[in-house]
């Protein structure tokens, strides 16, 4: 379940409930123990949610990211429909490999995929498979609208066309992965 839901918000309660629906009784503390074992085995990372306005890490609504996207494929036979989650997982692993501390950003009404910090450096990142219509473009670029600071903000997608707007920088996935950021 954890591997198959990389880049999705999880909780011990939701996993216990999902297993209970399949007649597999397990308690939330047991689920959290197993998540910790999976983390300790370097199969996945649990990423804290960070309240951007309150400037503090939150102890709930974390996301799990698999450390190797190959694991993701083990539990997903419909990977084509999951490109957005896979790209988010790849970007997370890239940020970690470059030495960033990574959080999920929580705004008043939404979420920013990543807050990346390394020393005094900080930036925000949204990941989308394709910016294929105006609704998706507005959603991805609009995720930054409630962030009052002036740290750099990026949208990463597979698109080759540059769609930078309102000071938010758009980057192609490959260009982002090959950059120092």
Residue spans of the language-model regions?
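Catalytic cores of nucleic-acid endonucleases
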Residues: 105, 129-174
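Conserved beta3 VAIK motif of the Hanks protein kinase fold
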Residues: 125
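Accessory nucleic acid-recognition modules appended to NTPase machines
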Residues: 1-122
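A broadly conserved detector of short glycine/acidic/proline-rich loop/turn motifs that flank catalytic sites
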Residues: 50, 70-71, 120, 128-129, ...
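Charged, structured surface patches that assemble and position nucleic-acid processing machinery
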Residues: 173-181
